[in-house]
Swiss-Prot record:
Protein name: Coiled-coil domain-containing protein 170
Subunit structure: Binds Golgi-associated microtubules.
Compartments where found: Golgi apparatus
Function, as annotated: Plays a role in Golgi-associated microtubules organization and stabilization.
GO biological process terms, semicolon-separated: microtubule cytoskeleton organization
Region annotated Required for binding to microtubules and Golgi apparatus location, chain positions: 355-591
Principal localisation: Golgi
Length: 715
């Protein structure tokens, strides 16, 4: 009784005022039943006290026996106290073990975090190695292309050497034929012949310079075409890689969603178990000795629920930030390319509808321009065929790397030999120029007079003038035809250049789109990492809750053991009451002790009143704690429901945007970056529509002007 009184007094000191607690009595029916039970117990105790007053009159004779028995009971109580102290020591040891185990758990968590960081570092190094391998493969492909170019240049140089040799031989034969005089003319003078020869030489040099310039322009255009093909190859490979990355990202996102669903289900199951355990704790409050421990457990659970509340609030804030960031991205896209004020959902939907209407009008305009674009599409089809062939060659080139390395040395030797041949050709060109100078010197009349004589000089001059006039007319006609052909080639190459420039502008737009897609994918990777971190935190929380459940179960078993001990004590009290009934037979001896017994009974009544008051205060305190826990659970549920509502709003917004863009929502799970990509395409098409129309108009006007130029040249 003394231990119970002290515990009740301690609980009463920490309990709140009765004015605050009586308001909640109507809400908790269990406490009313307990109060009725305690009142019935008090009434029974009072009736028993009245009976004992009558019995004490007959129990004075057996007081000495009772005192002896009380001494024995005091000895047993001291033994029980010693056992209680031993139990307290064991509890202290177990608490120290629990603290050490918690420290070990924290160390293990730190080790797991270190392992996760090491795994992330290894993954980063693996990605870097993969990127290096890809760059090396690109370098190998470029070296193969350079080898092919070198081999082609060597073959072209050989062909040019053979052609130059043939031309040189033909020129020598033509000069020999020209030097043979066939016809005569008496009108031309020596000075006229010299002037005509000089004019012919100047015209030949001018035409040669034009031919060299045209050949250089042709080579430059060919190199640009090759570079554009190489860029197309690289862009196609990058597109394939990025498509694979996008597929992997979608798969990982689905896995993360599944993990989140499983974590939410586990959390709900844990909440159910926590509720069941709270009900068990409420049932275990009938034991007075375990009330302090239950209150401490409730405080711990409330602190942990506050932590979970904070975590759920953080999750809600993250979901809100994701929703606002997604909406702000769309608003920023529409702001950057269109004049837009505000970033609400209604304004965004209105802008998207306006863009759809504009696109419909643009489609009508495009249907009119498709006839003009068909010619350009044919050229693009040819380039796509070249592109496919180049892809096949690239696949074959990876297998032929080892063989090409052996051929590299051979081709380098051939390059050296080609350089030697170029030097020889330059030397032969110099000889050829010297030979022409010598011919011009030999065409003088003094040398011809010295060789053939003075009499044959006029005949030789007339014959040469006639031959030179014929050759001059033939050369002029040939030069005109060559110049006309070169001008045609220049015009065709200019048209090709314009088409290639348009193609290059389209490719640059594609590159910009790909860069934006990369940025979106990096954002997705960051979101995936954040989701991984949240999942890990949830797993840690689940583990902690499971540990706490285990501890609560252990405490429940301990409480059951204590209940068994209390039952044993009740049995002992029943035995004592039987002994008291036996002692009541000796009432006559205890008449002298009535007054003392009455005083003791009054003190017992006061103690009972105090115990009842303390029990009420403890019950009210427990009710307050339960109400706090229930309010926290309600706030948690409300926050979760708000998060679910916001997720539904996000999903509805995505569905509306995707339906307006014409995407299939029901077939497959659409990622956010595809919707953003479609919006960016709409904005790009809105910006570049007028530019493309202007370019097409320029092309059509150029095509209308070119045939007029051809007619002028023919005239």
């Amino acid at each position: 009784m003394s231990l119970d009184c002290t515990s009740h007094i301690a609980l009463g000191a920490a309990s709140p005022a009765p004015e605050e607690t009586y308001d909640h009595l109507s809400e908790v029916p269990v406490t009313r039943e307990q109060l009725n039970h305690y009142r019935n117990v008090a009434q029974n105790a009072r009736s028993e006290l009245a009976a004992t007053l009558v019995k004490f009159e007959c129990a004075q004779s057996e007081l000495q026996d009772l005192r002896s028995k009380m001494l024995s009971k005091e000895v047993s109580c001291q033994e029980l106290k010693a056992e209680m102290e031993s139990y307290k020591e064991n509890n202290a040891r177990k608490s120290s073990l629990l603290t050490s185990l918690r420290d070990r758990v924290q160390e293990l968590e730190e080790e797991s975090a270190a392992l996760s960081t090491s795994k992330i570092r290894t993954e980063i190094t693996a990605h870097a190695a993969i990127k290096e391998n890809q760059e090396l493969k690109k370098k190998v492909v470029e070296l193969n292309e350079k080898l092919q170019k070198c081999s082609k240049e060597n073959e072209e140089n050989k062909k040019q050497v053979s052609k130059n040799c043939r031309k040189h031989e033909e020129f020598l034969t033509q000069l020999r034929d020209c030097l043979d005089p066939d016809e005569r003319n008496d009108k031309a003078s020596d000075e006229d012949l010299i002037l005509k020869l000089r004019d012919l030489r100047k015209e030949n040099e001018f035409v040669k310079g034009q031919i060299v310039i045209l050949e250089e322009t042709i080579n430059v255009h060919e190199m640009e075409a090759k570079a554009s093909r190489e860029t197309i190859m690289r862009l196609a490979s990058e597109v394939n890689r990025e498509q694979k990355k996008a597929a992997s990202c979608t798969e990982e996102k689905e896995k993360l969603n599944q993990d989140l669903l499983s974590a939410v289900e586990a959390k709900e199951a844990l909440e159910r178990e926590v509720k069941i355990f709270q009900e068990r704790l409420l049932a275990g409050q009938q034991v007075w000795d375990a009330s302090k421990q239950e209150v401490s457990l409730l405080k711990k659970s409330s602190s942990e629920l506050e932590k979970s509340l904070k975590a759920s609030q953080d999750a809600v804030t993250t979901s809100q930030s994701q929703y606002f960031s997604f909406r702000e991205k769309i608003a920023a896209l529409l702001r950057g390319r269109l004049s837009m004020t505000g970033s609400t959902e209604d304004t965004i939907l209105e802008k998207i509808r306006e863009m759809d209407s504009r696109e419909e009008s643009r489609d009508r305009m495009v249907s009119q321009l498709e006839a003009q674009i068909s010619e350009l599409v044919e050229q693009l089809g040819k380039e796509s065929g070249f592109h496919q062939k180049a892809l096949q060659r690239a696949q074959k080139a990876e297998n032929m790397l080892e063989t090409l390395q052996g051929q590299l040395t051979h081709l380098e030797a051939e390059l050296v030999s080609g350089g030697v041949l170029r030097d020889n050709l330059n030397f032969e060109k110099q000889k050829y120029l010297k030979f022409l100078d010598q011919l011009s010197q030999k065409m003088k009349l003094d040398q011809m007079a010295a060789e053939l004589g003075f009499d044959m000089r006029l005949d030789v001059v007339l014959a040469r003038t006639e031959q030179l006039v014929r050759l001059e007319s033939n050369a002029v006609i040939e030069n005109k035809t060559i110049a006309h052909n070169l001008q045609r080639k220049l015009k065709t190459q200019k048209e090709r250049l314009e088409s290639k420039e348009l193609h290059m502008s389209l490719l640059r737009q594609k590159i910009a789109q790909l860069e934006e897609e990369k940025q979106a994918r990096t954002a997705l990777v960051v979101e995936r990492d954040n989701a991984h971190l949240t999942i890990r935190n949830l797993q840690k929380k689940v583990e902690r809750l499971q540990k706490e459940l285990n501890t609560c179960r252990d405490l429940h078993t301990e409480l059951k053991a204590k209940l068994a001990d209390t039952n044993e004590l009740k049995i002992k009290t029943l035995e004592q009451t039987k002994a008291i009934e036996d002692l009541n037979k000796s009432r006559d001896q205890l008449e002298k002790m009535k007054e003392k017994a009455e005083k003791k009974l009054m003190s017992v009544k006061s103690e009972l009143d105090t115990t009842e008051h303390e029990a009420k205060e403890n019950k009210e305190r427990a009710r307050n704690m339960i109400e706090v826990v229930t309010s926290e659970m309600k706030t948690l549920k409300k926050s979760l429901e708000e998060a679910e509502k916001r997720e539904k709003q996000l999903a509805d917004f995505r569905e509306v945007v995707s339906q307006m863009l014409g995407l299939n929502v029901t077939s497959l799970a659409l990622p956010d970056y595809e919707i953003i990509k479609c919006l960016e395409r709409l904005v790009h098409s809105h910006q570049h529509h007028f530019v493309t129309c202007a370019c097409l108009k320029d092309v059509t006007t150029g095509q209308e002007r070119h045939p007029q130029g051809h007619l002028q040249l023919l005239h």
